[in-house]
Each structure stands twice: as structure tokens, then as C-alpha cells.
Design a protein with these regions (language model features):
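Hydrophobic transmembrane alpha-helices and their immediate loop junctions
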Residues: 1-394
Length: 394
């Protein structure tokens, strides 16, 4: 669900000033054929060279990575005014366990928690026979929901992992997060052990997860809606997931307008696809370390923080607008209005306090994003709008 930077376990010891000066001279000799050096500076253990590149940034980065590694440094290319800065940072080793026991255990526990959650979604008439049979069969009624949701999340994480390895970024295996409520999971995270090489690589790693997950979610919702049915509405009312523009359109194309007094009873596979769309939409918020935040950085560079803050402000405004609209629609019922608009405030709060607005830049922050990737980035932002439900549960 989210690419989370790993916490450093051990950083190369900060060398004494005299050693830094010696290293600075060695690094300068390895930079001079790549950068016409106009200025150099030592900031603690960081050595900065400023000037004009003599070759294109991607090639410069490849050369400098190999040249700096023997000295225990890694290069970062930055634009500073009208000059290019080559920053040499000490190498860091990150605490990403190489054993996969924890990954496997969390995956198994998450499978069980989503299976239990799936029992609450097995109310479709399709499962009448299962509900009438043994306890074991009733328990297995949670499989369609659990299998579908885990497939969406698993392929999402696999998209991140495979793309990161292809782009030579060091990442961990996914850590799935079980939950005793809701859908039975809070998604998964992948720990990054190294920065992305450039904006294209950063974009590929970020966008691969949501797009891969949607490649499973769309067939799932088509099948789920095909197996859903329109039934009479129960006398006491019912609780249902709120529609996004995407899910409403797909349901309308399948069933047309629902007659008064009837409701759509969705198959658990459709419920799991709905959950997959929601998780993907939340991940595409252009904020911080979320997939959408990485896409925003690749698209807009240093403006990504302003975009993230504007996104949170927009969520709060939508929350206030939703509350006022529902307050009027319910005849002044403040509790009902707050319940209908609470999701906007929760999303804004979680993003602000748990995700934040910081993003680790790539090694090469000079090379622009390719036009094709810019188009895919716009598609991802459109998908966010289409998949985000104004009301989660009504």
C-alpha cells in the first residue's frame, strides 16, 4: 500500500574535519571531468560541489555512484539557482531484516483476519446454501471477500516490489498489516533501503502498485456485480458502502436505476473490489510518502509540499461542506451530519499526523519526467477522483 523509508540502523561514522578535507580533495578529482567546479563546500560530513555539468545528468550519476562508493559516499544531483550541486553524502545502512519470517507471519495473519471480515459480507443470496450447511462451510463463505481483497493488495505490493528491483532500488518484501475491524487489514508497507535513482524511477515504483492492483480490482468488480442481485429493501433499513463515481457508474450499467423499495445486494467479491478501490484512492492522495505523493514529486518536484498541504486543506473544506449540506438535508440533525462527513476529517488528520508532507528526493533530481509518464500521472489523479466515495458508509 505504501512505500515507507526504512529507519537508518547504522550510518558511516562522521569523519574528523581533517579526514573530510582529504576525502573532499579525492572526491573533487573524481568530479572534475563531470562537473566544471565553480564552488565547493564542506557541511559536516557532506561535501558539496557546485558548477555546470559537462554530460547529461543520468550519465553523470552513473559515473559518480561508482566513483564515490570506494570513499563511502553516495552522490545526489540538485539544482541550486543557475548551478548544479553534486552533494556527496556518507553511505547509510538501513534496518531492513533479510529474514522473511515476519513477512510470512503477517501475511498469514492478514489472510485470517480478512477471512473473518469476509463473513460479514457473505449475505448475498448466492451463499444461501453455505449458510444452511456446516459451520466449516459457513466459515469458508468469507473466502470470496478475503481472496479478492488479498489478491488486490498482494498484486499492488508486487507491482511496487518488482518495479523497484527492476530499477535497482533496494526494497524489502511487503509487510501486511492485519486489523481486527473493518476489512480485516490496513494494507501493507514496503521498506525502501535506498533512494530512487531519478524521477522516472520514482514515478515507476510509485505508480506500479496502484495500477497493478487495479488490474485485479476491475475484473473483480465486474464479476462481483454479475453475481449481485436487486432485492426488496428490509423494513428496518440497511447499511451500505457509499458509491464513488466509478462504482455508481458500473452498477448503473449493470442494473440500471434501482426501483423504489429495492436495494442492490452486492456479492462479497464486489465488496472486496470496493475496498480495493478505496485503498487505492487513499494511496493516490498527492501527499508525502503515499504513492500519490511520490507521483506528485516526480511530476512537480519541489512544489510537492505545497500540493500536499493544498490536498489536506481541500479535504477539510470538503468535510465542512459535506457537514453543512447533510445538516440541512437531515433537518438539523448534527450527529447524522457529522457521521456522514466524518471520513473527510479522518483522512485529513491521518495524512497530516501519520504521513506528513516530507518526501525523500531521488539521487538525480535534475532529469525531467518523460512525457508518457506525465500522461500516466494525470490518469492516476483522475482515477483518484473517480474512485473516492464522498460518503464511505450510509
Amino acid at each position: 500500500m505504501r512505500l515507507w523509508p526504512a529507519r537508518p540502523r547504522r550510518r558511516s561514522a562522521v569523519p574528523p574535519p581533517e579526514d573530510v578535507l582529504v576525502t573532499e580533495e579525492q572526491l573533487r578529482r573524481n568530479v572534475e571531468d563531470v562537473l566544471v567546479v565553480r564552488d565547493r563546500q564542506v557541511r559536516g560530513s557532506v561535501v558539496v560541489f557546485r558548477g555546470v555539468l559537462t554530460i547529461e545528468p543520468r550519465r553523470a550519476l552513473e559515473l559518480l555512484i561508482d566513483r564515490f562508493r570506494p570513499f563511502g559516499y553516495t552522490p545526489f544531483l540538485r539544482q541550486e539557482g543557475d548551478t548544479v550541486a553534486v552533494q556527496a553524502w556518507p553511505l547509510a545502512e538501513t534496518a531492513v531484516p533479510r529474514r522473511i519470517g515476519v513477512n510470512v507471519l503477517l501475511f498469514v495473519v492478514t489472510c485470517l483476519s480478512t477471512l473473518v471480515a469476509g463473513l460479514s459480507f457473505a449475505g448475498s443470496p448466492t451463499f444461501d446454501a453455505l449458510r444452511a450447511s456446516s459451520s466449516a462451510a459457513r466459515f469458508l463463505a468469507g473466502l470470496p471477500f478475503a481472496f479478492t481483497l488479498m489478491a488486490i493488495l498482494g498484486v499492488h505490493e508486487l507491482g511496487h516490489y518488482v518495479t523497484a528491483r527492476y530499477d535497482r532500488a533496494a526494497v524489502s518484501l511487503p509487510y501486511f498489516i492485519p486489523a481486527p475491524f473493518g476489512f480485516g487489514t490496513l494494507g501493507a508497507i514496503i521498506l525502501m533501503r535506498s533512494p530512487a535513482r531519478d524521477r522516472n524511477s520514482l514515478f515507476d515504483i510509485a505508480a506500479a502498485g496502484p495500477l497493478a492492483g487495479l488490474a485485479v480490482a476491475f475484473p473483480a468488480i465486474f464479476l462481483g456485480l454479475a453475481w449481485s442481485s436487486v432485492v426488496p429493501m428490509p423494513p428496518g433499513g440497511y447499511t451500505a458502502f457509499g458509491d464513488s463515481a466509478l462504482t455508481w457508474t458500473l452498477a448503473y450499467l449493470r442494473f440500471g436505476p434501482i426501483p423504489p423499495g429495492y436495494m442492490l445486494f452486492t456479492h462479497p467479491m464486489a465488496d472486496a473490489a470496493w475496498a480495493g478501490f478505496l485503498v487505492t484512492a487513499l494511496n493516490l492522495f498527492p501527499v508525502g510518502q503515499l504513492d500519490g505523493g511520490r507521483i506528485a514529486y516526480a511530476l512537480f518536484g519541489r512544489y510537492h509540499r505545497a500540493i500536499g498541504k493544498a490536498t489536506v486543506s481541500a479535504l477539510l473544506l470538503f468535510g465542512v461542506g459535506s457537514f453543512l449540506w447533510n445538516f440541512r438535508a437531515t433537518g438539523g440533525d448534527a450527529f447524522a451530519a457529522l457521521a456522514s462527513s466524518l471520513n473527510w476529517f479522518v483522512w485529513a488528520g491521518l495524512i497530516s499526523f501519520l504521513v506528513g508532507f516530507h518526501h525523500t528526493p531521488p539521487l538525480d533530481d535534475l532529469s525531467p519526467l518523460s512525457p508518457g509518464r506525465r500522461l500516466v500521472g494525470v490518469v492516476c489523479l483522475v482515477l483518484l477522483v473517480l474512485m473516492l466515495p464522498p460518503v464511505v458508509i450510509h
